[in-house]
Amino acid sequence: MTSTEEKTTSGRVVRITGPVVDVEFPRGSVPELFNALHADITYKELSKTLTLEVAQHLGDNLVRTISMQPTDGLVRGVEVTDTGNSISVPVGDGVKGHVFNALGDCLDEPGYGKDFEHWSIHRKPPPFSELEPRTEMLETGLKVVDLLTPYVRGGKIALFGGAGVGKTVLIQEMINRIARNFGGTSVFAGVGERTREGNDLWVELEDANVLKDTALVFGQMDEPPGTRMRVALSALTMAEFFRDEQQQDVLLFIDNIFRFTQAGSEVSTLLGRMPSAVGYQPTLADEMGELQERITSTRGRSITSMQAVYVPADDYTDPAPATTFAHLDATTELSRTVFSKGIFPAVDPLASSSTILDPAVVGDEHYRVAQEVIRILQRYKDLQDIIAILGIDELAEEDKQLVQRARRLERFLSQNMMAAEQFTGQPGSTVPLKETIEAFDKLTKGEFDHLPEQAFFLIGGLDDLAKKAESLGAKL
C-alpha cells in the first residue's frame, strides 16, 4: 500500500530550462497549482533537496514548475515528490531575532524553527467586512515627511526613486525611528537586493536593540527568480500571523518591491507567456494586487508597510512603479535633482503626496502651513527658467524675496539622519510634529529671512537652527 501511495505522489523530471522544470506524474496524480515538490540531487559531492513550485498544468500529466534554488546538478529522470501542500514558513514569536529564506529555512541557525507552527505563503486577503480604514498619523520625526507627506498608521507607504538616491538608507532610517518607538513587532523582507545591505541591517538592528522584536526574510540578488518572487509573500505571512493570531500592530518593511515585479517578469518569460508593455508580464496588476491586498488593517489591528520602489531610469510611467501607485496611502519620491544639491533625505516635496494631508485629519494649522510651503516651492520652480535666462536680478522684488525664502525652505527640509551618523559624524535628530509646524510657519512668514541659508542646512528643529545661526554670526 505504501509503495502504491509513493507512486501516486512521485513524478519524473522530463525537461529543465534554467529555473523552469517540467515534471511528469502518473495519470490522476497531477499536483495542484502552487504545490511544493521536492527533488533530491547530488552535485559536486553535496546532497541537497530542491523545492519546486507548480506554476502551470501543461496537460498529458505534465506540470511546469519554478525552482526555488539553482538547478545545477538536476538531470532528466530524477524522482520528484509532491508534498501535497504549498510552500509554508514558520510563524510565531520564535521567528523574531532570526533570518529566514523564502522557504522558511533559518539562515543564522540552520534547522531552527522546523518544529514551529507553519502557515502557507499563499493566503487569501481578509474579507471586506473585516477591513478597517485608518487615518491616524504615524509620526516619524523627519520634518519633510511629517509636514508634507504624513504617513498613515496601518497604511501602505512607498519610497520611490531611481538608482542611488537613498531608498535603502531611508528604509533603514525608518526602521531606526519607528521600530525603536513602536514597541511592536517588525518584519523585514529583503527582495532581490544586495546581501551586504542585509548584513548591515542585521548589525544595525542588533546595535539598536530592536533585533529581538524583528523577523528578517531574505531572497537576495543572487537567488533564482522563483525565490525573489516568493520572499515578499513569506515575510507577509509571518506578519499576518502577528496581526491575526496575536492581535498585534505590525510593521512590514519591503526592500525592494520592484525586484518582486522583476522576478515575476523573468518567471513569466520562462513560462512562455506573451510579454505585455515594456516586456513585463501580462499578469503584473494581478500579482501586485495579490500581495498588496493582503497588506491591510483589520478591526483593531494593523500592518503598516513601508516599501522601497526602484524606478527604472527615473521613469515614473514605467508599468512597475505605475502599478504600485494605485495601492498606496502615502508616496515619498526621492529626486536626483534634490540629491545633487546635497539635500538629504532627497525628498521631492512637490511630487510626494499623502491621502491624510487633509484638514479633517491633520488639523487646519498643519494643512495651512504645508500648503504654504508647497505654494512657495512651486512658485520657485516656476521661476527657474526665468532665473536661468535673465538672472535673479530681473525678478520683481516680491519674487526675489520668495526665491530667497524658498531656498531656505529647501535647506530646512534636509535633516541629519541616524542611519548616516557614521558618514556625517553628526547624531541624527528627531523633531516633534508641533515644533516642525511652528518652525515652517515662522519661515514662510519671513521671520527667519535675516538668517544665512547655510544655517538651515542639515539640522533638526529650532534649537539646532539657533546654534547653527550663532556659529555663523547671526541670531534668531
From Swiss-Prot:
The keyword Cytoplasm does not apply. CDD domains: ATP-synt_F1_beta_C, ATP-synt_F1_beta_N, F1-ATPase_beta_CD. One of its GO terms (molecular function) is ATP hydrolysis activity. It is an enzyme of class 7 (translocase). SUPFAM superfamilies: C-terminal domain of alpha and beta subunits of F1 ATP synthase, N-terminal domain of alpha and beta subunits of F1 ATP synthase, P-loop containing nucleoside triphosphate hydrolases. It is a peripheral membrane protein. It is found in: Cell membrane. Gene3D superfamilies: 2.40.10.170, Bovine Mitochondrial F1-atpase, Atp Synthase Beta Chain, Chain D, domain 3, P-loop containing nucleotide triphosphate hydrolases. Its EC number is 7.1.2.2. Keywords: ATP synthesis, ATP-binding, Cell membrane, CF(1), Hydrogen ion transport, Ion transport, Membrane, Nucleotide-binding, Translocase, Transport. One of its GO terms (cellular component) is plasma membrane. Pfam families: ATP-synt_ab, ATP-synt_ab_N, ATP-synt_VA_C. InterPro entries: AAA+_ATPase, ATP-synt_VA_C, ATP_synth_F1_bsu, ATPase_a/bsu_AS, ATPase_alpha/beta_chains, ATPase_F1/V1/A1_a/bsu_N, ATPase_F1/V1/A1_a/bsu_N_sf, ATPase_F1/V1/A1_a/bsu_nucl-bd. ATP binds at G161, G162, A163, G164, V165, G166, K167, T168. It catalyses: ATP + H2O + 4 H(+)(in) = ADP + phosphate + 5 H(+)(out). Its main location: membrane. It comes from the Bacteria. F-type ATPases have 2 components, CF(1) - the catalytic core - and CF(0) - the membrane proton channel. CF(1) has five subunits: alpha(3), beta(3), gamma(1), delta(1), epsilon(1). CF(0) has three main subunits: a(1), b(2) and c(9-12). The alpha and beta chains form an alternating ring which encloses part of the gamma chain. CF(1) is attached to CF(0) by a central stalk formed by the gamma and epsilon chains, while a peripheral stalk is formed by the delta and b chains. Belongs to the ATPase alpha/beta chains family. Produces ATP from ADP in the presence of a proton gradient across the membrane. The catalytic sites are hosted primarily by the beta subunits. This is ATP synthase subunit beta. The gene is atpD.
